Amino acid sequence: MVLVTGIGRCGTSILMRCLKEIGFYIGANCVWDEKIRAGYELPVASNINFSMCRDYFGKGNPINLDDHIHNHYGKLIDLTYRQAIGMVDEKGFIKVIKDPRFTWYPDIVEAWWSVRQDFKLIICHRDIESVVKSRNMMPKEHSDLKNRGALQYKEDFADFFTKVLQLEIPYETLFFPNFLRNFKSTYNVLEKVGLHFDYDLGKKVWDCLIDRELLKET
């Protein structure tokens, strides 16, 4: 399984959209929001991470994997964090999952790795000042718990990446927007994490999708 993550507004969504159009299964109920040109988070995974953020980090408490998880409405459900993480794609149908919350607190990716070590990371990154500028342009209803300044985002990413290195989690990186115009390099990264597909087919899908997205920015 591949987890795609990044601090936000750094190309994770467009990467997922491309993978979906190539033919990779990214899970049920993963939707694209044209208003912000982003999406494709797997609800079951994002709910686990969102619940961790709400239950622990707002209160300064360490993650207890044997606590019961809350749903998006704050209601306890009959699953512990350990069970819920282990059940994500337990049948192996989903090839790639996206959620930016893995970068928010290093304890989140550590919690997942302590339960299951069957995933690799694709870490999308971007100039932090550009991330903040892009986030500030988003509608208020799409703001998130980590609506912070450049220094805080730099610290978040440093803490996250240090934890990835410490735990020796396999990873590859893509830098936004550079990777949008370098399909060969992007293809090589996807191959390295086990996302195999025909190069020519992928390039055709990629070029068409990237051209459409760039056209919307003009």
Predicted regions located by residue number:
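PAPS-dependent sulfotransferase catalytic domain
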Residues: 88-197
